[in-house]
Design a protein with these regions (language model features):
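Classical Sec-dependent N-terminal signal peptides that target proteins to the secretory pathway
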Residues: 1-21
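Non-catalytic tandem-repeat scaffold regions and their flanking low-complexity/translocation tails
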Residues: 21-248
Length: 248
């Protein structure tokens, strides 16, 4: 009898609490607790806990608004919202990366490459910024550009379009600014290219270091070492800037 009584009490408690009162961690400091949506310890006033979902880094959407880091993004018409990929979304013919509008993006050809990169027929974007819009280099056909498998490595990128293979380096200009420099990899077979690490790539005939052929290398015995350097049967290839290449 006592067991039956305890079960009834437990069921009544659960019925009164309800699922809406159970704390739920959505991620990136967002949570739902007691029918309220929180960012950290702050209540997001007006946010709907029944429809709130995390759609990107610190990016939350419900049936009325989109929030970034706990702040409502202005001028969003939620009925026209479309998620394009993690961190990228569209609203009223405007493309956004997180909370930033991508100026002059081509809506028709826009495509998300991964959570931090996208493209349209004119540009490649990191976040909301075009990486090929300066004199640091150009990608001949952005519309057909794709990253190579394993081609996104920290500040180093490898990709190709229907014409060329590209080595893309993000270089620090000073303590606060960086810029992408884009180099066409010459004489490479774009249909046989393979990324070995952030310094070395290869095709069916040659090994390339930061986008340039390593001359005199023994192709068949070349391998990448655990520390990232390379070696063949004759010597080791230690990473240094291009004007200081050293082999032993």
């Amino acid at each position: 009898m006592k067991k039956i009584f305890l079960k009834i009490v437990l069921l009544l408690i659960l019925a009164n609490v309800g699922f809406g009162d159970i704390a739920q961690n959505l991620g990136d400091y967002y949570s739902i607790n007691k029918g309220k949506v929180y960012y950290g310890n702050e209540i997001l006033e007006g946010a709907n806990p029944k429809t709130a979902e995390l759609i990107g880094f610190s990016l939350l959407k419900d049936d009325k608004n989109v929030y970034y880091m706990g702040k409502k993004i202005k001028d969003v018409k939620i009925k026209n919202f479309e998620k394009l990929g993690k961190n990228y979304w569209k609203n009223d013919n405007k493309i956004y990366y997180r909370d930033e509008k991508i100026e002059n993006a081509d809506i028709i050809s826009f495509k998300v490459l991964n959570e931090d990169y996208a493209k349209d027929k004119n540009h490649i974007y990191r976040g909301s910024e075009a990486i090929d819009s300066s004199l640091s280099g150009k990608i001949k056909d952005p519309e057909t550009f794709e990253f190579l498998p394993n081609g996104i490595i920290y500040g180093t990128l490898y990709g190709k379009d229907k014409y060329n293979v590209y080595y893309i380096k993000n270089k620090m200009l000073n303590c606060f600014d960086s810029s992408y420099f884009i180099y066409e990899v010459k004489r490479i077979n774009k249909d046989k290219v393979e990324v070995l690490n952030n310094w070395f790539i290869k095709d069916d005939k040659n090994i390339y270091f930061e986008g340039e052929i390593l001359e005199g290398l023994d192709y068949n015995t070349f391998e990448v070492l655990p520390n990232g350097d390379g070696k063949d049967k004759n010597r080791s290839y230690e990473y240094l800037p291009k004007d200081e290449w050293r082999w032993f």
